[in-house]
Amino acid sequence: MEEEDHATFAVGNPSHRFDRPLIRRSSDSISNLPDEILHHILSFIPETNLVIRTSVLSKRWRHVWSKTPHLSFEWLMVSPKLINKTLASYTASKITSFHLCTSYSYEAGHVHSSIEFAMSHNVDNLSLAFSSFPPCNKFPDFFYTSSSLKRVELRSASLTPSCIVSWTSLRDLSLTRCNLSDKSFLKILSGCPILESLSLKFCESLKYLDLSKSLRLTRLEIERRSCFREPMQSMQIVAPHIHYLRLRDSEAHCTFLV
């Protein structure tokens, strides 16, 4: 009789026996996914400090963020102290992408330690954006040596390598408002043997680009414009291997030798 009453109750009140477990299973369906898929989901969240907030969702989520291969920090929104604490809690051995936006002159020591952390974790894609203008930073020597970097994007940086550059896996280099001499740029190119794509935006200090030894470099994008309405010097470019060329808003004469 007890079983019949129980069965009757189950049929007469399905919400008590069926709906609630279904809701529970639905809420756990994402949490039950493998870490790799959860990391992919977290990669769509733009900033790491927001990713960390998912750790309060449940015990399952508590440490998921600490192995996400994508790290992104905006130091205008997050303090360097908090970033250091975040990196100290990071447990993955490999970083796919690392983005940092900050004022270099104010936090140079923190910037160097963050870059070193990313490179020690064999980062593939490195993006650094500095708010100081004109560029005033000086990267340490270890910055110019990496066998893992595949893409480097720098904004408002000063590139003056005093050591041999060795970016042996780099395929894509993007520089915006960066300060570097023709000699420094040639030194960087010599350390990128498989470079395929190069973007130079508002790097007005460059006057001569010799890309003849970059045999795999087939894509070139250049954008030049004077910010202070001062006349710019012409640029001479030697690029015999380029298949795709894009010039944008160029106010200065460019001479191509192919």
Swiss-Prot record:
Residues 27-76 form the F-box domain. CDD domains: F-box_AtFBL13-like. InterPro entries: F-box-like_dom_sf, F-box_AtFBL13-like, F-box_dom, F-box_plant, LRR_dom_sf, LRR_FXL15/At3g58940/PEG3-like. LRR repeats lie at residues 101-130, 136-161, 177-202, 224-249. Keywords: Leucine-rich repeat, Repeat. It comes from the Eukaryota. PANTHER family: OJ000223_09.16 PROTEIN. This is F-box/LRR-repeat protein 25. It comes from Arabidopsis thaliana. The lineage of its organism: Eukaryota, Viridiplantae, Streptophyta, Embryophyta, Tracheophyta.
